[in-house]
Regions:
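A contiguous binding-surface segment within folded domains or other stable secondary-structure elements
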Residues: 63-93
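Generic signal for short, ordered secondary-structure residues
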Residues: 11, 24, 72-75, 86, ...
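Membrane-proximal alpha-helical anchors
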Residues: 2-67
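An amphipathic alpha-helical interaction surface
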Residues: 82, 87, 92-165
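Charged, low-complexity surface segments at secondary-structure and domain boundaries
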Residues: 42, 68-69, 126-130
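Amphipathic, non-membrane alpha-helical segments in soluble helical-bundle scaffolds
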Residues: 3-6, 42, 76-83, 108, ...
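N-proximal short alpha-helices
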Residues: 2-5, 9, 13, 80, ...
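Long amphipathic alpha-helical segments that form oligomerization/scaffold cores
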Residues: 45-74, 136-151, 159-163
Length: 165
């Protein structure tokens, strides 16, 4: 065997090993992404099933949200905290959906209409707070998520799962 032949074989082997490493790396990244999405989905489901989240949902659906930042600040501390906590939960959920870390289908199937109803209650206060703080980014992902859920419910409402069987 000549040195040229050996060099060609070595170069081919090197190229093949680089291709194999690249394919392996791509597969690993896809697997890690899928695992992360699955983990976040399960975590979101667990969060929706906590007593704390149930209390937040119950409060928000049963009470009016103050229309202004000032009226929100005058609420008893525990009520203001509940209103803030629920908005933070919805904001976090919106971020997870916007960044495609969890699928909007999960939100639609679990608390979809709640997001829209809650945003309807929060909207006036949040818009007031955005102007007065000023913080134009306040609850932007909560608003975005509620708008996406509304669009889905209007344009392509899903059928209840039990009707599919």
């Amino acid at each position: 065997m000549t040195s040229e032949t050996i060099t060609v074989i070595a170069n081919i082997a090197l190229a093949v090993s680089a291709i194999i490493a690249l394919v392996f790396g791509i597969v690993q990244v896809k697997t890690a992404t899928r695992d992360r999405r699955e983990r976040l989905t399960l975590e979101a489901l667990r969060n929706f099933n906590t007593r704390e989240f149930s209390e937040l949902m119950n409060y928000v659906t049963a009470h009016d949200i103050p229309p202004t930042h000032e009226k929100w600040q005058k609420l008893p501390a525990h009520e203001g905290i509940i209103i803030t906590q629920f908005a933070q939960e919805m904001e976090s959920l919106g971020i997870l959906v916007a960044e495609r870390l969890i699928n909007i289908d999960l939100v639609d199937k679990t608390i979809g209409s709640l997001v829209s109803i809650a945003w309807g209650k929060y909207k006036v206060m949040i818009q007031d707070s955005r102007k007065k703080r000023p913080d134009p980014f306040l609850c932007e992902y909560f608003e975005w998520l509620a708008e996406r859920i509304d669009e889905r419910m209007r344009n392509a409402p899903r059928k209840p799962f039990y009707l599919k069987w």
